[in-house]
């Protein structure tokens, strides 16, 4: 090139000198272009003419590495080589040969284009792939290269607060970080909205925002994307991370307001020119309640979604105070009010602390007896209120000198002597909004002098009533007996065939008062062979007895005797006539009616009501019925073994 230029300068220009020169340049350019074309064709034929084709796949999905081979091309064979070694070998009209077992069932080659298809992608499948294509009647092997990237399907990005810094002008510098779980590479991050007060760093995954309480609380959204997917995060309000800039730099605690659970409360701001104020913002935890001039109070959308009660919190249009209805326990805490100017700067700040208490129920007192000895009663009392919490104060009245109070004054140990009056203790539970008390009666635990006196009086009255009852019963029974006459049977009527009684057969009768008689007729004497001189007289001797007195029949010594025995009450009777025998009692509390047919003698035996003691039996050989009268006398108690009939009884004949 240099020689022609120098040579051209020495020649003088002529009329046709320029044409030969142009034709030489054209010829040279044509030769150069032809050479470059063959060079490019050779490079393309060897497969080194272009960069690898980039292909992206999703983890667990499928991908195809395409080959642009026309249908008319005669292919001898195609070999696919993976990141480490040969993968597959394919020939026309033959089955594909898989050379790596880890790809069995996941790898395939299309029939006409010989493209490579991989399914169920894994992270190990990423890398470089090469296809060697051999054509018939063509000596050069054509190569195609691919680069495979395998990406995960992105999950929803998560935004976290990394740091908060508070400046002196009530502003906060909040740093947010966006991340996607399981995706650390090839992920691009972006934030919306883009504001002049916000800046991004670290590939867009970190956002730093500077704001004041008076600035609008805009929602920030993080978007993450990779070649196969794109996801966005939930809106994040940075105002929730900077709700107390004044207190963070040492502001005052302000006023304390006490509220009652379930009732309304007002947090005062005392701002007379509330209507002329540009904006008032109340902050509480993650809640923001703001009111702009000539507008109703608005709450953060995040607050409304969490609050089941609509319009439960609002800012008063009169003095910009914060009003809360139906207080909940979670409403307690610090509140901060900021008054803003037109330039969104803070002009004043107020702190209010809200405390919430329950109205107390009636206290419950439980007690346990420690021990009671030496006349001293010692007990432990515990006072508690259901759902009272840790803010309940307990007091005991009256409080003795020896009493011991513990566990926040809810536990009391007290003692007293049995000779002392029992103290009635009162537990009072109180909190800042309510007060309730309950009295404990200690007389129900240990017996004292008053209780002993009452016990003895009660026992005495019971004994008196019992005695009066017994005495009344005895009087009633006595009157009942005296009203019924007692008598002995008169002479029985003899049957027609029985002769009249003779002098040797006399019937005696005795009239007695106040004695019990057997109400069961005597059993007749059994018929036995007797002499003709004996008269059989049915005396029909009948005595009356209480219905509940059983009747007993008992044989004695082979004879049957019927006793009509009556004992007369009173001590003012004349002594018994001569021959009258005093008989000792026989077998008390048993009524016996005996009939004996032996020597024509019949006796009847009756018990009195007082002692239930029978009179001894007597024996006689005559056919006579006797009544015996016994005078009251003091007789020693009978012995069990002394139930014998006197050997020589004497009777008096009243005939």
Curated annotation (Swiss-Prot):
Superkingdom in the source lineage: Eukaryota
SS bond partners: 172-242, 178-222, 377-446, 383-427
Stretches for region Disordered: 521-556, 633-655
Stretches that traverse the bilayer: 455-476
Function: Self-ligand receptor of the signaling lymphocytic activation molecule (SLAM) family. SLAM receptors triggered by homo- or heterotypic cell-cell interactions are modulating the activation and differentiation of a wide variety of immune cells and thus are involved in the regulation and interconnection of both innate and adaptive immune response. Activities are controlled by presence or absence of small cytoplasmic adapter proteins, SH2D1A/SAP and/or SH2D1B/EAT-2. May participate in adhesion reactions between T lymphocytes and accessory cells by homophilic interaction.
Motif (ITSM 2): 624-629
Xref: InterPro entries: CD2/SLAM_rcpt, Ig-like_dom, Ig-like_dom_sf, Ig-like_fold, Ig_sub
Ranges where the Ig-like V-type domain occurs: 48-158, 251-363
Topological domain ranges for the Cytoplasmic compartment: 477-655
Cellular component annotations (GO), alphabetically ordered: external side of plasma membrane; plasma membrane
Positions occupied by motif ITSM 1: 601-606
Name listed for the protein in its UniProt record: T-lymphocyte surface antigen Ly-9
CDD domains noted in UniProt: Ig_SLAM-like_N (cd16842)
Tissue expression: Increased surface expression on T-cells of systemic lupus erythematosus (SLE) patients.
Residues with Phosphotyrosine modification: 603
Keyword Disulfide bond in annotation: yes
SMART domains for this protein: IG
Glycosylation sites: 68, 95, 120, 169, 173, 285, 413, 424
Alphabetical UniProt keywords: Adaptive immunity, Cell adhesion, Cell membrane, Disulfide bond, Glycoprotein, Immunity, Immunoglobulin domain, Innate immunity, Membrane, Phosphoprotein, Repeat, Signal, Transmembrane, Transmembrane helix
Impact reported for residue 602 to V: Decreases interaction with SH2D1A and INPP5D 2-fold, reduced T-cell response
First and last residue of the signal peptide: 1-47
Biased composition (Low complexity): 530-542
């Amino acid at each position: 090139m240099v020689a022609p230029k120098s040579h051209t300068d020495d020649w003088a220009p002529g009329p046709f000198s320029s044409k030969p020169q142009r034709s030489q340049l054209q010829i040279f350019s044509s030769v150069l272009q032809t050479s470059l074309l063959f060079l490019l064709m050779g490079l393309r034929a060897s497969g080194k003419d272009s960069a690898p084709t980039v292909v992206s796949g999703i983890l667990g999905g499928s991908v195809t590495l395409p080959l642009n081979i026309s249908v008319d091309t005669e292919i001898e064979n195609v070999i696919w080589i993976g990141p480490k070694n040969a993968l597959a070998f394919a020939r026309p009209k033959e089955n594909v040969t898989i050379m790596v077992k880890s790809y069995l069932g996941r790898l395939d080659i299309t029939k006409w284009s010989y493209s490579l298809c991989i399914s169920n992608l894994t992270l190990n499948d990423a890398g470089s792939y090469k296809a060697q294509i051999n054509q018939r009647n063509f000596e050069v092997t054509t190569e195609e290269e691919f680069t495979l990237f395998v990406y995960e399907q992105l999950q929803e990005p998560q935004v976290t607060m990394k740091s908060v810094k508070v400046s002196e002008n009530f502003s906060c510098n909040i740093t947010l970080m966006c991340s996607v779980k399981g995706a650390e590479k090839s992920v691009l991050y972006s934030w919306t909205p883009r504001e002049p007060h916000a800046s991004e760093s670290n590939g867009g995954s970190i956002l730093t925002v500077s704001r004041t309480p008076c600035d609008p609380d805009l929602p920030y959204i993080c978007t993450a994307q990779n070649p196969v997917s794109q996801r966005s995060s939930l809106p994040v309000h940075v105002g929730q991370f900077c709700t107390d800039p004044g207190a963070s730099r040492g502001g005052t605690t302000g006023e304390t307001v006490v509220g009652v659970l379930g009732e309304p409360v007002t947090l005062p701001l005392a701002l007379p020119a509330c209507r002329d104020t540009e904006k008032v913002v109340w902050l509480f935890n993650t809640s923001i309640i703001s009111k702009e001039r000539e507008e109703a109070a608005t709450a953060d959308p995040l607050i409304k979604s969490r609050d089941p009660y609509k319009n439960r919190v609002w800012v008063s249009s009169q003095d910009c105070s914060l009003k809360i209805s139906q207080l909940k326990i979670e409403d307690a805490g610090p509140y901060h009010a900021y008054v803003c100017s037109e330039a969104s700067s803070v002009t004043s700040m107020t702190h209010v602390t809200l405390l919430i208490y329950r109205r107390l129920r009636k206290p419950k007192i439980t007690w346990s007896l420690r021990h009671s000895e030496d006349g001293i009663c010692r007990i432990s009392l515990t006072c508690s209120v259901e759902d009272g919490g840790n803010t309940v104060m307990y007091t005991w009245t009256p409080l003795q000198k020896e009493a011991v109070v513990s566990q926040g004054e809810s536990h009391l140990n007290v003692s007293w002597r049995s000779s002392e009056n029992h103290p009635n203790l009162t537990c009072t539970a109180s909190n800042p909004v309510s007060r309730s008390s309950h009295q404990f009666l200690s007389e129900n635990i240990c017996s004292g002098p008053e209780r002993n006196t009452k016990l003895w009086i009660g026992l005495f009255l019971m004994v008196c009533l019992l005695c009066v009852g017994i005495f009344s019963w005895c009087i009633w029974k006595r009157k009942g007996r005296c009203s019924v006459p007692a008598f002995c049977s008169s002479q029985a009527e003899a049957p027609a065939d029985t002769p009249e009684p003779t002098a040797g057969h006399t019937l005696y009768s005795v009239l007695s008062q106040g004695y019990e008689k057997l109400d069961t007729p005597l059993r007749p004497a059994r018929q036995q062979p007797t002499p003709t001189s004996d008269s059989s007289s049915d005396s029909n001797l009948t005595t009356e007895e209480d219905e509940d007195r059983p009747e007993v029949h008992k044989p004695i010594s082979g004879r049957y005797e019927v006793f009509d025995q009556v004992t007369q009450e009173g001590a003012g009777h004349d002594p018994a006539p001569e021959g009258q025998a005093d008989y000792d009692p026989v077998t008390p509390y048993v009524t016996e009616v005996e009939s004996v047919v032996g020597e024509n003698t019949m006796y009847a035996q009756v018990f009195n009501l007082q002692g239930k003691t029978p009179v001894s039996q007597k024996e006689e050989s005559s056919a006579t019925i006797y009544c015996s009268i016994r005078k009251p006398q003091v007789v020693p108690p009978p012995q069990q073994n002394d139930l014998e009939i006197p050997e020589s009884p004497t009777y008096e004949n009243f005939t």
